[in-house]
Amino acid sequence: MIRVITGIAHNAVTVKDMDESLRFYTEALGFRRAFDIDRPETGEPWIVYLSIRGGQFLELFYGGTVDNPWNDALIGFNHFCFEVDDIHAAARQVQDAGWPLDVAPKLGADGNWQAWVTDPNGIRIELMQISPESPHARFE
């Protein structure tokens, strides 16, 4: 089988409050606002692209109005996981930006360090520092 997928270009979420979401992703996680796209039909704001690094983006869509609380029983989306170089520095940055950690840095069952925070839209975010001994580092 030919591997046709070369990477994850972006993930997208619809947000309740764009300003608060931008503050979380830029101040707490350090993403950079890359560019905006307006609706072609109306010229109204539609999508804000945040640069994670190296061609990886998070799309934030304006206009969420219905809560979808995270729940293990739901089928489909569960959480985002973002890789970090230093789990403790990343956790401090999140807290310094005003967001409480749901789970402080700890060693996970996979051998990687992890910490958890919830974004302003109720989306669970896992921060992960990959250990050289973990299955993630050894794969491929």
List each language-model region with its residue ranges.
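Active-site beta-strand termini and strand-to-loop segments that position acidic
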Residues: 50-54, 117-120, 130
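Conserved catalytic-core motifs of GNAT/GCN5-like acyltransferases
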Residues: 32-40, 105-108, 112, 132-135
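Helix-adjacent hinge/juxtasegments
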Residues: 60, 69-74
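Short, charged/polar surface micro-motifs in flexible loops or helix N-caps
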Residues: 53-57, 65-67, 85-89
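Vicinal oxygen chelate
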Residues: 17-19, 73-75, 80-124
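Core segments of cupin and vicinal oxygen chelate
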Residues: 14-57
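N-terminal beta-strand motif that seeds the catalytic metal site of vicinal oxygen chelate
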Residues: 1-20, 77-82, 131-140
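Conserved beta-strand in the GNAT
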Residues: 59-61, 116, 126
